[in-house]
Amino acid sequence: MQVTLLRSFSNDIPEFTVTEITGVLQRFMQETFYSIKVRGEISGLSRPNSGHVYFTLKDSNSVINAVCWNGTRLKVQFCDGLEVVCTGYLSVYQSKYQLIVTDMTLAGYGKLAAMLAELKKKLELEGLFSPARKKKLPFLPTKIGVITSPTGAVISDIISRVKQRFPSNVVVWPVQVQGDRASAMVIEAIKGFNSFADPPHVIIVARGGGSFEDLWPFNDEELARTVAASKIPIVSAIGHETDFTIIDYAADLRASTPTAAVELVLPEKSKLVASINEKFVRTKISFERIVKMQEYRLLRLHGILTEKKNSLLQKSRVALEYQQKIRYLLQVSLLRKRQYLESLMQRLSYYDSKHILSVGYAIVRDEHEKQISSVEALSTNDTITIELKDGKRRAIII
């Protein structure tokens, strides 16, 4: 850019337009502060849809505007309150100077550790880490979702370990595992797996070891809440055994390493087959023992039933004999009763009026058909009826 100095008519003091003086300052800034490091605390963080990140760096006395252009890869994730050292250069925009950030590192771990402890306590009080809300892993998942970097040793180790233990379908959702976009990409991956019509049975979130800065994205509060809200069980495998992040507490299970995560998720096929064979042998032996016991029991029951059968047959024969005797006695008794009744009937027949009439007797009745048994009941001119064996006649007493 060419700068032309305009002379004032009043004196020799140079005169600039706003654009010119801004250009001079821009050039001065770029030439003087083309590569600097500025230490301060991030505040006023803003992420518009453009993908650029706007924030301010402040210390106890001053504030400077800063911007990180979309596409700049940083190891540290932006977070209000972080104390960082930003590498970049100064630039002038709209008559204001700002720091263009090209790299960023953590300034110290003391404040970070305090922030992490505070977040952990907050989520713990909410019950986010409670064992009661953790989901059990499926016994033998046939589909495993893996959220990790598509390159590097981690994904290779996981796939290799899956093949060794129990070959299963592995669906990889590639993400960045460090830097400013890491936590957002992991959140998107977890939500994406949960939205599948045929989702994986378990999810492994993994990355290899790294510095405190490298692992910082996995201390994100929104990520921890997303992990806890997942309907699919999640195993966290971040860093090495001594590395702990917030999602390790929010996950349903924590593995010390990515390969250890596979070992928690999948049983070893050879051991599983051996265990099944052992259980089969035990079951077979137990079944054979039960069969023999039942055979012995059936034989005993057969013997008992045979004895009972013979006893029942004997009792049946005795019962039949008693039945025949009872039938005979009943017949004899009935015959005697019949004879007795016949004799009674014969006796009664002698007292029947017809029988009496048949031997020459007569029955006398008055005009009211009342039987007369004494002459004293009769008077002269009384009309009577005389019944004989072969008929009746009327008569008058004279």
From Swiss-Prot:
Subcellular location(s) of the protein: Cytoplasm
Superkingdom to which the source organism belongs: Bacteria
TM ranges: none
Its EC number(s): 3.1.11.6
Gene Ontology CC terms, in alphabetical order: cytoplasm; exodeoxyribonuclease VII complex
InterPro entries listed in its UniProt record: Exonuc_VII_L, Exonuc_VII_lsu_C, OB-fold_nuc-bd_dom
Biological processes annotated in GO: DNA catabolic process
UniProtKB keywords: Cytoplasm, Exonuclease, Hydrolase, Nuclease
Pfam families xref list: Exonuc_VII_L, tRNA_anti_2
Keyword Mitochondrion assigned: no
Role this protein plays: Bidirectionally degrades single-stranded DNA into large acid-insoluble oligonucleotides, which are then degraded further into small acid-soluble oligonucleotides.
Family statement drawn from the similarity comment of this UniProt entry: Belongs to the XseA family.
Protein name in the entry: Exodeoxyribonuclease 7 large subunit
Gene that specifies this protein: xseA
